[in-house]
Amino acid sequence: MAKVLVAIRVNPEDIDVDLDKLVNEIKARMPEKFEVVRHEKVYIAFGLYALRLFIIMPEEYEGGTEDLEELLTSIEGVSSVDIEMVTRTEAF
């Protein structure tokens, strides 16, 4: 069964948000069958960094990435999210 790999940028509310804690909070709140397989910090400007997450989710998940976006924006410290890429994969 194929899965979907989503690259999503998570923008913090401000420069003081601890991105390591934010990643742990996001991983803890992922629904069943969703997995953060990789994350990295992305420099924005003036000392501000965002998170780029690579998340595996079921291909047949109803609603696509909408629920994932809502979940991420509901977490304290998250200002907004941007879907950067969605691709089908059988590698995971």
What role is predicted for each listed range?
Residues M1-F92:
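Long, contiguous binding/interaction regions
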